[in-house]
Design a protein with these regions (language model features):
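Alpha-helical transmembrane segments of multi-pass small-molecule/ion transporters
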Residues: 1-293
Length: 293
């Protein structure tokens, strides 16, 4: 988390003076960076079958929330695909995982990574058609799943784990994974710099994002806490999953919006505002979890 503010600051300056840079950076970051990041996280954490319960809870929370938000009733509050996706997918890579490393025992890392992997799979499978406005069908979902950077990253990690070089590659890929996170933060700062230069960042624009922010930072972690309680998850697993659910909107939402050239300003505003608010809301969730025992 130490790189958060410097990267946002430098990115903002770059975006202010070089407004075309975000458009050029997003495609290669999605195409090559995301698979490397996923592979590095998987190899580093050593994900095993004991995280299956956490994976199912994550799938139920994010997938179920997206299905619920498809109802026309929610269109009034979350009018764009980018707000619906941003309300349920969290930025666990640069925010949630470091929070777990800082606040919880090392055993919690695997559960944080599995949340990130499941969330990334859903984001990169459902996200492109949802944001671009293309009608979602079974065939299109399968096509997006096959082309998903997360699936490519998982495939790379599985293949590497089958070789004797897995420990070495885990160390080598960890640093490229961190570089991808830094580049994604720079991209967010650049997009915000472009928005500030054009006057797109203002109170009315952020007001429209309020329902998505409330859902992401308050409602989603509360639902995850209820699911963990109902399934009698251990305290460590519960704490990890709730803190991951409380993470700000995923930078992947901005990357998909950039690649689709749709609702980019709304995506950047949602990621930026949720990140700032999460600096206060996540510690409050942590204190609440400690009080609950």
């Amino acid at each position: 988390m130490l790189e958060l503010l410097p990267c946002l600051g430098f990115g903002l300056l770059f975006g202010w003076h070089r407004p075309l840079w975000p458009v050029r950076l997003a495609p290669p970051l999605v195409r090559f960076g995301v698979p490397l990041s996923i592979a590095g996280l998987v190899l580093r954490s050593g994900v095993h079958w004991d995280v299956l319960g956490a994976a199912l809870l994550t799938l139920g929370l994010i997938g179920g929330s997206l299905l619920l938000l498809l109802w026309p009733l929610w269109r009034r509050w979350l009018p764009w695909g980018v707000t619906r996706l941003g309300a349920v997918t969290g930025n666990t890579g640069y925010f949630g995982v470091p929070v777990v490393l800082a606040l919880l025992p090392p055993a919690g890392l695997a559960f944080a990574v599995i949340y990130d992997i499941v969330g990334s799979l859903i984001t990169w499978t459902v996200g492109p058609p949802l944001i671009s406005g293309v009608r979602i069908s079974g065939r299109s979902l399968v096509a997006h799943l096959v082309r998903s950077p997360s699936v490519q990253g998982m495939t790379l990690a599985v293949l590497l784990q089958l070789t004797p070089l897995a420990p070495v590659m885990a160390s080598w890929l960890w640093w490229p994974a961190r570089v991808v996170i830094v580049l994604a933060l720079l991209l967010l700062g650049m997009r915000l710099g472009v928005m500030l230069r054009s006057g797109e960042v203002n109170a009315p624009a952020l007001e429209v994002l309020r329902p998505a922010l409330l859902a992401k930072l308050l409602l989603l972690p509360a639902v995850m806490w209820a699911l963990a309680a109902m399934t009698a998850q251990p305290a460590l697993v519960r704490d990890v999953l709730v803190l991951q659910a409380a993470a700000p909107t995923a930078i992947s939402v901005l990357l998909i919006a950039e690649a689709s050239s749709r609702d980019v300003s709304e995506a950047a505003g949602l990621v930026f505002a949720s990140t700032l608010l999460a600096l206060f809301s996540v510690p409050l969730w942590w204190l609440l979890l400690q009080a609950l025992g």
